[in-house]
Amino acid sequence: MSEQADKCNSRWKDEAMQNGYIPSYLDKDELCVVCGDKATGYHYRCITCEGCKGFFRRTIQKNLNPTYACKYEGKCVIDKVTRNQCQECRFKKCIAVGMATDLVLDDSKRLAKRKLIEENRERRRREELQKTVWDRPEPTQEEWEMIRVVTEAHMATNAQGNHWKQKRKFLSAVGVKEAKPEDIGSAPIVNAPEGNKVDIEAFSQFTKIITPAITRVVDFAKKLPMFCELPCEDQIILLKGCCMEIMSLRAAVRYDPESDTLTLNGEMAVTRGQLKNGGLGVVSDAIFDLGVSLSSFNLDDSEVALLQAVILLSSDRPGLTSVERIERCQEEFLLAFEHYINYRKHKVAHFWPKLLMKVTDLRMIGACHASRFLHMKVECPTELFPPLFLEVFED
């Protein structure tokens, strides 16, 4: 490199530029050493702008420099205004400031390099993700005890346990019948009533299981020390608020894709249409959709139990007096729940936030059912409503 080029190189590198984004590895306000435009990074061993980088690359790749000819004896001043007026002087300046021709790759090498960069980037992303997953905190000893208590409470109050598929019976037009292998996927459907009317026969079948289902939710709550320590008035409000949500969750996790049914209270398998016609209307769609969604989560008993505890201890139920206390209880369960999810190491992306969204879905189901309940009271004979059902869902 000539002495004059060395001086130019030093002068260009010392110049500053106002504003403009540059990579973090460059000094602030760096200029292109060729034309003085905004520099975007190190390109072919020099700090240059995108324009000069592209010009230099094209010149080398297509061997264009022999075709360049200066009209002014090779003495053109190259800046961001004049850089496109003389290709020969611009290329000479690129060489003078130190841009390396041997670093310009042909198409095949450039594609291979790009592929390698993408592969390395993806590998680092996977390693970072794996490191993040494995480094997340798992339950403490106290949290394990909390998880044990809530899991046992759920299993002790969850009808038929893990044997619900063997124990279930299908709702039919003539009542409830035993489930047989050939019944799967072909359970008879009660004829849909006209308009928005409730199918009284289906509703009467549902009322037979509603009281034990509600009782099991109450029993679940009573087995949690945090809940039992709350004032009785708050316990009642929490139970009335969460009952439909927990029953819906328990039905949703017993969704069977083969027969496209939910199993209520661990014993009655119903189709979407039967649940809708039996009084729940559009609420049935929300419960079935939740069941379909949860089937990909592969929740275990502890996760279902913790989800129920989080729903039970919702501090925003109207009329509560111990709001802060209930909020703290829910936060303890949420933290233990998150740590347990870390321990389980699910392969579903963003598993924890996606699962928390199901709480929102269940709250919506509860709100929709409250509205639907008023319609059911109009459509169905009062004597068909079990006393506990009315006690829980009437305001």
From Swiss-Prot:
<keyword id="KW-0804">Transcription</keyword>
<keyword id="KW-0862">Zinc</keyword>
<keyword id="KW-0539">Nucleus</keyword>
<dbReference type="GO" id="GO:0045944">
    <property type="term" value="P:positive regulation of transcription by RNA polymerase II"/>
</dbReference>
<feature type="binding site">
    <location>
        <position position="86"/>
    </location>
    <ligand>
        <name>Zn(2+) 2</name>
    </ligand>
</feature>
<comment type="similarity">
    <text>Belongs to the nuclear hormone receptor family. NR1 subfamily.</text>
</comment>
<dbReference type="GO" id="GO:0008270">
    <property type="term" value="F:zinc ion binding"/>
</dbReference>
<dbReference type="Pfam" id="PF00104">
    <property type="entry name" value="Hormone_recep"/>
</dbReference>
<dbReference type="InterPro" id="IPR001628">
    <property type="entry name" value="Znf_hrmn_rcpt"/>
</dbReference>
<feature type="region of interest" description="Modulating">
    <location>
        <begin position="1"/>
        <end position="31"/>
    </location>
</feature>
<dbReference type="GO" id="GO:0030154">
    <property type="term" value="P:cell differentiation"/>
</dbReference>
<keyword id="KW-0479">Metal-binding</keyword>
<keyword id="KW-0805">Transcription regulation</keyword>
<dbReference type="InterPro" id="IPR013088">
    <property type="entry name" value="Znf_NHR/GATA"/>
</dbReference>
<feature type="domain" description="NR LBD">
    <location>
        <begin position="142"/>
        <end position="395"/>
    </location>
</feature>
<dbReference type="InterPro" id="IPR001723">
    <property type="entry name" value="Nuclear_hrmn_rcpt"/>
</dbReference>
<feature type="DNA-binding region" description="Nuclear receptor">
    <location>
        <begin position="29"/>
        <end position="106"/>
    </location>
</feature>
<dbReference type="GO" id="GO:0006355">
    <property type="term" value="P:regulation of DNA-templated transcription"/>
</dbReference>
<keyword id="KW-0863">Zinc-finger</keyword>
<comment type="subunit">
    <text>Interacts (via the ligand-binding domain) with ncoa2.</text>
</comment>
<dbReference type="InterPro" id="IPR050234">
    <property type="entry name" value="Nuclear_hormone_rcpt_NR1"/>
</dbReference>
<feature type="binding site">
    <location>
        <position position="32"/>
    </location>
    <ligand>
        <name>Zn(2+) 1</name>
    </ligand>
</feature>
<keyword id="KW-0675">Receptor</keyword>
<dbReference type="InterPro" id="IPR000536">
    <property type="entry name" value="Nucl_hrmn_rcpt_lig-bd"/>
</dbReference>
<feature type="binding site">
    <location>
        <position position="89"/>
    </location>
    <ligand>
        <name>Zn(2+) 2</name>
    </ligand>
</feature>
<dbReference type="GO" id="GO:0000122">
    <property type="term" value="P:negative regulation of transcription by RNA polymerase II"/>
</dbReference>
<feature type="binding site">
    <location>
        <position position="70"/>
    </location>
    <ligand>
        <name>Zn(2+) 2</name>
    </ligand>
</feature>
<dbReference type="GO" id="GO:0042671">
    <property type="term" value="P:retinal cone cell fate determination"/>
</dbReference>
<feature type="zinc finger region" description="NR C4-type">
    <location>
        <begin position="32"/>
        <end position="52"/>
    </location>
</feature>
<dbReference type="GO" id="GO:0000978">
    <property type="term" value="F:RNA polymerase II cis-regulatory region sequence-specific DNA binding"/>
</dbReference>
<dbReference type="GO" id="GO:0005634">
    <property type="term" value="C:nucleus"/>
</dbReference>
<dbReference type="Pfam" id="PF00105">
    <property type="entry name" value="zf-C4"/>
</dbReference>
<feature type="binding site">
    <location>
        <position position="216"/>
    </location>
    <ligand>
        <name>3,3',5-triiodo-L-thyronine</name>
    </ligand>
</feature>
<dbReference type="GO" id="GO:0004879">
    <property type="term" value="F:nuclear receptor activity"/>
</dbReference>
<feature type="binding site">
    <location>
        <position position="369"/>
    </location>
    <ligand>
        <name>3,3',5-triiodo-L-thyronine 1</name>
    </ligand>
</feature>
<dbReference type="GO" id="GO:0048384">
    <property type="term" value="P:retinoic acid receptor signaling pathway"/>
</dbReference>
<comment type="function">
    <text>Nuclear hormone receptor that can act as a repressor or activator of transcription. High affinity receptor for the thyroid gland hormone triiodothyronine (T3). Transactivating activity is ligand-dependent, and is repressed in the absence of T3.</text>
</comment>
<dbReference type="InterPro" id="IPR035500">
    <property type="entry name" value="NHR-like_dom_sf"/>
</dbReference>
<dbReference type="GO" id="GO:0048839">
    <property type="term" value="P:inner ear development"/>
</dbReference>
<keyword id="KW-0238">DNA-binding</keyword>
<dbReference type="GO" id="GO:0002154">
    <property type="term" value="P:thyroid hormone receptor signaling pathway"/>
</dbReference>
<feature type="binding site">
    <location>
        <position position="52"/>
    </location>
    <ligand>
        <name>Zn(2+) 1</name>
    </ligand>
</feature>
